[in-house]
Amino acid sequence: MLTAEEKAAVTAFWGKVKVDEVGGEALGRLLVVYPWTQRFFESFGDLSSADAVMNNPKVKAHGKKVLDSFSNGMKHLDDLKGTFAALSELHCDKLHVDPENFKLLGNVLVVVLARHFGKEFTPVLQADFQKVVVGVANALAHRYH
């Protein structure tokens, strides 16, 4: 999946990410850009507009929770399937989340990182990071196969 050099680059970069800010924005953007994903978050209250979604405290809190789990995965890049096994089971068996949504969230996360870090998020770093989000999405979808 990743070379030692790529792992070092994404791990060093991830240390700069403010998971509370980036997580809330990434989940919020997912819900705005792909509105059908909102059905999994009906208990979050007002999701009636982009502004409502992006300022919703439950969206922000859950986005942080999602990125906290992602951060754990960043510590276990060689065992993403094992790291995300319980979450894969939860999302498959209990929540019935379409596994395509994991890919969508990963892509939205890359957009948010580019927005937050600008030129520091180079094309090479983006390519390395894209491998990570694909790996995480595949690990989360593992239970579905």
Swiss-Prot record:
Pfam families: Globin
Tissue expression pattern: Red blood cells.
Originating organism: Bos mutus grunniens (Wild yak)
Residues recorded with modification N6-acetyllysine: 58, 81
Gene Ontology, cellular component aspect: blood microparticle; haptoglobin-hemoglobin complex; hemoglobin complex
Function: Involved in oxygen transport from the lung to the various peripheral tissues.
Phosphothreonine modification, residue list: 11
Entry's family note: Belongs to the globin family.
PANTHER family given in the database record: HEMOGLOBIN FAMILY MEMBER, HEMOGLOBIN SUBUNIT BETA
Record lineage: Eukaryota, Metazoa, Chordata, Craniata, Vertebrata
Single GO term (MF): heme binding
Residues modified to Phosphoserine: 43
Gene assigned in the entry: HBB
Name listed for the protein in its UniProt record: Hemoglobin subunit beta
InterPro entries: Globin (IPR000971), Globin-like_sf (IPR009050), Globin/Proto (IPR012292), Hemoglobin_b (IPR002337), Hemoglobin_oxygen_transport (IPR050056)
Sites bearing S-nitrosocysteine, chain numbering: 92
UniProt keywords, alphabetically: Acetylation, Heme, Iron, Metal-binding, Oxygen transport, Phosphoprotein, S-nitrosylation, Transport
Domain Globin, residue spans: 1-145
Highest taxon of source: Eukaryota
Self-association state and partner proteins as the record states: Heterotetramer of two alpha chains and two beta chains.
PROSITE patterns (UniProt xref): GLOBIN
GO biological process: hydrogen peroxide catabolic process
Binding-site positions, heme b: 62, 91
Variant or mutagenesis effect after changing residue 134 to A: In allele beta-I
